[in-house]
Amino acid sequence: MRSEWVARRRGQANVTQMHFARQGVITEEMEYVAQRENLPPELIRSEVARGRMIIPANINHTNLEPMCIGIASRCKVNANIGASPTSSGLAEELEKLKLAIKYGADTVMDLSTGGGDLDEIRTAIIQASPVPIGTVPIYQALESVHGKVEKLSAEDILHVIEKQAQQGVDYMTIHAGILIEYLPLVRHRLTGIVSRGGGILARWMLAHHKQNPLYTHFRDIIEIFKKYDVSFSLGDSLRPGCLHDASDEAQLAELKTLGQLTRMAWEHDVQVMVEGPGHVPMDQIEFNVRKQMEECDEAPFYVLGPLVTDIAAGYDHISSAIGAALAGWYGAAMLCYVTPKEHLGLPNAEDVRNGLIAYKIAAHAADIARHRPGARDRDDEMSRARYNFDWNRQFELSLDPERAREYHDETLPADIYKTAEFCSMCGPKFCPMQTKMDAEALSELEQFLAAQPTG
């Protein structure tokens, strides 16, 4: 779809959406996003120019259907997929991608660390995906030196970043905010460093007693991103991995650095979103969102949950969706889903489905709470369908129509029950929605009440 759009941009030193937005240009991607969001194109342009919105759209991902991430637009949901050395491979991950898109993922991250040729897996995912694809390039960089962290060099990392940009990756998690001087701050944590990328870089810094190479080479990464329009997703390497560690000195020190890196990228018109926690008690979520907005000048906030309790193993998609809904309400722009397998194992296709639906609920609830225009229209239509016992319409309006139909038909499978004025919960005699309060009856009641003596 985008081949003609990007053809005339090729060869330019800077092809980012932010660069064009700051020149006053409304790109085809901005026009497309404006239609999807039902917002004025000029608003999209101004938000991208300001840095409050990003349109992750690598010029080499030509089959992409552009979308945006930002406070002015709908709250978005990301789904993580990816093969591992011990489970899954290309075929399974392509099936997960298909399911993720079916159930409403706005972006997908390929977090493959094994299971085959990583370049082959990534290329296949990009070619099959109409939604933006994100990656964490430090994973492949480590794989390129056979997992030996101490042998990893800045050149190895930059080579992988450039290669993934050429392949069409739309945004990359870059863990540039974890500095060597922050490592002692995790001494009193219960769970230390829980970011895989952050852990890799921490081990590298401990081995070499040198500064984080992603930080020292951040300008080199900016130059790569300018050429392909790759967006930064600044990784929170020191995010809390449990409630005990939330909002601590280590997390907030890194957040300040992420703000500095955001402004550095903006100086070169490179798009940025900032990643956030993690595991956060409900009463600290608003603080975390407000603090990110303050430190990072309102760059879009992309949160992993957060989980609001640490004891829901097997149900962390629920624990985290609670936190995600609150974060979205307070201003987070994108929610990274958590599946029931979080902390337990690699998610399968059904886990992807359950995690995504939980997060679509959270994002939608946030949009309603933020009074986004039209956010509640579908809910009101569902309510009308319920009141009219229009079962098929109820299924259609559900976030997961197949599951809604499956649960209804579990007890009342016959077609005749698709027009019945009850379900198996109340049966034919006790459903309160059968009590129709028609206008004529209510008018008569009002007249009766008005005629009653007062006092």
From Swiss-Prot:
Keywords from the named record: 4Fe-4S, Iron, Iron-sulfur, Lyase, Metal-binding, S-adenosyl-L-methionine, Thiamine biosynthesis, Zinc
Gene Ontology cellular component list: cytosol
Pathway in which this enzyme or protein is active: Cofactor biosynthesis; thiamine diphosphate biosynthesis
Molecular functions per Gene Ontology: 4 iron, 4 sulfur cluster binding; carbon-carbon lyase activity; zinc ion binding
InterPro entries per record: ThiC (IPR037509), ThiC/Bza_core_dom (IPR038521), ThiC/BzaA/B (IPR002817)
EC number, UniProt record: 4.1.99.17
Cofactor(s) in the UniProt record: [4Fe-4S] cluster
Residues involved in [4Fe-4S] cluster binding: 423, 426, 431
Lineage top rank: taxon: Bacteria
Residues engaged in binding Zn(2+): 279, 343
Binding site for substrate: 80, 109, 139, 175, 195-197, 236-239, 275, 302
Cofactor note: Binds 1 [4Fe-4S] cluster per subunit. The cluster is coordinated with 3 cysteines and an exchangeable S-adenosyl-L-methionine.
GO terms under biological process: thiamine biosynthetic process; thiamine diphosphate biosynthetic process
Reactions the enzyme catalyzes: 5-amino-1-(5-phospho-beta-D-ribosyl)imidazole + S-adenosyl-L-methionine = 4-amino-2-methyl-5-(phosphooxymethyl)pyrimidine + CO + 5'-deoxyadenosine + formate + L-methionine + 3 H(+)
Main function: Catalyzes the synthesis of the hydroxymethylpyrimidine phosphate (HMP-P) moiety of thiamine from aminoimidazole ribotide (AIR) in a radical S-adenosyl-L-methionine (SAM)-dependent reaction.
Family: Belongs to the ThiC family.
Protein name: Phosphomethylpyrimidine synthase
Origin species: Synechococcus sp. (strain JA-2-3B'a(2-13))
Top-level taxonomy: Bacteria, Bacillati, Cyanobacteriota, Cyanophyceae, Synechococcales
